[in-house]
């Protein structure tokens, strides 16, 4: 028996309404019979229940979200597996039912946010991401559809479903690209490991869209957009924006992850500085303890390769002892060998492009997608040095009087009930 209205999972969670269908499962509004509260239940799709890889990914999602506890991260309450009348066991997550609206729906309705609301959203999101980054987790799919805003202006990040612990064995296939093309970091589009700086890049794209009303890169398909993230600089932001705001977004959208803010905390601190009227601080280029600095995105140009080769040769010469003037013969290649090397390089580049095309998601953020996965329970607070500073900037109350249209709500996000004291904000469009 497939999930349907009235089904009770594990004798406790009674499904009441289908909210959304995503890549891995369905999200239902349900009632917890034991505690008498409304919850969201994400049920793994039946066609994936017999697939060990999908089952493991679903379990990993539960473990990931169970590590985190922060007001800015939607909560997970429970995980379980339930027998479905002879169809085998089906896994599910029980999550916080968020009373809010996804940012992509807000932007669709308003065009862009006022500057003060955009900066408030970015700082809150950065501080919430820092909790995950301090725990060794990378979200890998930061986008407006995964950023919810409650009637009081509280930001909640959802859908850590493709997040993975940086130090854990990957569940996804080697080289698999995870993320959404419009918001993907260049290193992710190339199939490299995602880092906290990758989340910062994606959040920078969100910020670009929030303050300008458009995404930095557009194209006919996911591959085109992803290649622009890899190779092209973002178009200049509108000149009516303050210089420090433009500088903040420009820093987060550099191609080299080592040149960005290294995690959500330093980014949030930079946003706080901008909100206070100061210039954003330059990112620290010191890599996190125990990790090598990420490599720059390769440009594929002969000049870059030649410069790197020359630098390595010079360093090698300095480190070798004198050999009495004897120099080994210089290695040369025949024209046939050079042709083979050139062909191998072209084939390698084509392989990367094909991999991106096969696995990257659709370019838009409004198409049906996997339901966001809220997150919860941390085993203690991270050290103060990992929090990225204190949240000194006051959170704005985004609530205004009057009705708010709720179009395009996604995941398990629900509009306020008639008993809500405040309706969702009709966000001010920046002039």
Swiss-Prot record:
Residues with the Phosphothreonine modification: 8, 21, 64-65, 90, 125, 152, 158, 172, 174, 180, 224, 252, 302, 313
Keywords recorded for this protein, A-Z: ATP-binding, Cell membrane, Kinase, Membrane, Nucleotide-binding, Phosphoprotein, Serine/threonine-protein kinase, Transferase, Transmembrane, Transmembrane helix, Virulence
Gene Ontology molecular-function annotations: ATP binding; protein serine kinase activity; protein serine/threonine kinase activity
Start and end residues of each stretch annotated as Disordered: 276-333, 366-418
Database matches in Gene3D superfamilies: Phosphorylase Kinase, domain 1, Transferase(Phosphotransferase) domain 1
Induction line: Expressed predominantly in exponential phase.
Entry remark concerning the domains of this protein: The extracellular domain is dispensable for cell growth and survival in vitro. The catalytic activity of PknA is confined within the N-terminal 283 amino acids.
Name of the protein: Serine/threonine-protein kinase PknA
Gene of this entry: pknA
């Amino acid at each position: 028996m497939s999930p349907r209205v009235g089904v009770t999972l594990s004798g406790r969670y009674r499904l009441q309404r289908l909210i959304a269908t995503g890549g891995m499962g369905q999200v239902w509004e349900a009632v917890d019979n034991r505690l008498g509260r409304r919850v969201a239940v994400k049920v793994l799709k039946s066609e994936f229940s017999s697939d060990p890889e999908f089952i493991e990914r679903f379990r990993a999602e539960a473990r990931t979200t169970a590590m985190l506890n922060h007001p800015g991260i939607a909560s997970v309450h429970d995980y379980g597996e339930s027998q479905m009348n002879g169809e085998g066991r089906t896994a599910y997550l029980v999550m916080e039912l968020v009373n809010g609206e996804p940012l992509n729906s807000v932007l669709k309705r308003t065009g862009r946010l006022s500057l003060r609301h955009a900066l408030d959203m970015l700082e809150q999101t950065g501080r919430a991401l820092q909790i995950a980054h301090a725990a060794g987790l990378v979200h890998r799919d930061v986008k407006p559809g995964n950023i919810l805003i409650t009637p009081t202006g509280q930001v909640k990040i959802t859908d850590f479903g493709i997040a993975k612990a940086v130090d854990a064995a990957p569940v996804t296939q080697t080289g698999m690209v995870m993320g959404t093309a419009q918001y993907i970091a260049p290193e992710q589009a190339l199939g490299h490991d995602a880092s906290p700086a990758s989340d910062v890049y994606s959040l920078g794209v969100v910020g670009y869209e929030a303050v300008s009303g458009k995404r930095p890169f557009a194209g006919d398909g996911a591959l085109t957009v992803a290649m622009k993230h890899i190779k092209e600089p973002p178009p200049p932001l509108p000149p009516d924006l303050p210089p420090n705001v433009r500088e903040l977004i420009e820093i987060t959208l550099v191609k080299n992850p080592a040149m960005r803010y290294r995690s959500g905390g330093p980014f949030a601190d930079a946003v706080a500085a901008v909100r206070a009227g100061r210039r954003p601080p330059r990112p620290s280029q010191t890599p996190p303890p125990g990790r090598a600095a990420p490599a720059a995105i390769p440009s594929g140009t002969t000049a870059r390769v030649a410069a790197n080769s020359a630098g390595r040769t010079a360093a090698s010469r300095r480190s070798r002892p004198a050999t009495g003037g004897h120099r080994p013969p210089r290695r040369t290649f025949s024209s046939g060998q050079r042709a083979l090397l050139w062909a191998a390089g072209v084939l390698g580049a084509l392989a990367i492009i094909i991999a991106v095309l096969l696995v990257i998601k659709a370019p838009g953020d409004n198409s049906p997608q996997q339901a966001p996965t809220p997150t919860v329970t941390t085993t203690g607070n991270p050290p103060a040095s990992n929090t990225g500073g204190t949240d000194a900037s006051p959170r704005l109350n985004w609530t205004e009087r009057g009705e708010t249209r709720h179009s395009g709500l996604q995941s398990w996000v629900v509009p306020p009930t008639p008993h809500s004291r405040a309706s969702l904000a009709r966000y001010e469009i920046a002039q």
